[in-house]
Amino acid sequence: MLPDEILIVATEASADLHAARALEELRKIRPGIRAFGVGGPCLRAAGLETLYPTEDLSVMGLAEVLPKIPKILGVLHGMREAAARRRPAVALLVDSPDFNLRLAKHLKRQGVKVVYYISPMIWAWRRGRARKIAQVVDRMLCILPFEERFYEGTGVSARFVGHPFAERALPGDVAGYRAALGLPAGRTTIALLPGSRRSEIDRIFPPMLDAAERIKARHPDVQFVVPVAVTLQEGVLRPALSRHASLEVRLVSGRADEVVGASDAVLVKSGTSTLETALMQRPMVVVYKMAWLSYWVARLLVRMSHFALVNILAGRTVVPELLQQEASPERMAAEIERLLSDPGARRAQLDGIAEVRRSLGEPGAARRVAEEIAGVLP
């Protein structure tokens, strides 16, 4: 076993970012540490020896996963073989439970300590998996405040480390962000965040643009801005944009925080982006569309009254949620219009968002993750 080598698996863009920050903090504690595994641009920049790139594995939903199963199984086998050959002291597995819990089972058999960062949402479904997790995970590091309590009595050693987004400073004013992006200061500005996966964009971006047409009919001066995830090429968005030549849509590579900060309102795909938008203290409408097979499976399994993270954390409806057929261009446009024209609705949402931000814990999540890893290293 190599005491100065760890395995890291981050199969999503957000996991890549959070894992990279944890690795940087770990090197402050153990300067000679080496890391290999699955990662994206952030982990590569942090010095990960990348055996498989995150970009090849990022998928969502049953229907989207099926075509990639051979590749996913190949990566799973490859990581098992690499771990057996290199014998790392610790594995840091980030999110992606369907992949990482399978890998964790094999790693435990090999004697590798498993630190799992970002708990699976078993509190929403699969509640019975907690005891199975206890058999394959040495430390569960939770980023939502209620998750540590959820694991009590299950045999899982869990700790709330705070949310990585709590690191962020309070946002600046709209004018500063618009200046940084080269956007006109006085125009109505709407951010469109359709997601970071090709399958999501194909399903969500076209109706978002249809909604944008309706918004423009009432606000002729409106400009739209889309932050393009670092794991995507702008060309993925072009087919949908080509059908809306009359819209003024600015594409920005990355810089999602600045795009949101520059906006009067945000139309955002459900996921971590909703929390990012909340931390920028901008009003939003949350939408999601998935393949119908995935949707019906989720309906059978999920036991939650909300699907937007902001509402889950608040325990009530703070932001509008539009799912499947409700995520129509008409509804999207109407909800955005309400945020633009109704000061009371806008203020009520922003007050709820402020409560959610306070619930995320103190800054320093990456440092606490690094301390947990260092604590199980030989």
Segments the model singles out, each with a brief description of its role:
Residues 1-378:
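Nucleotide-activated sugar donor-binding and catalytic core shared by glycosyltransferases
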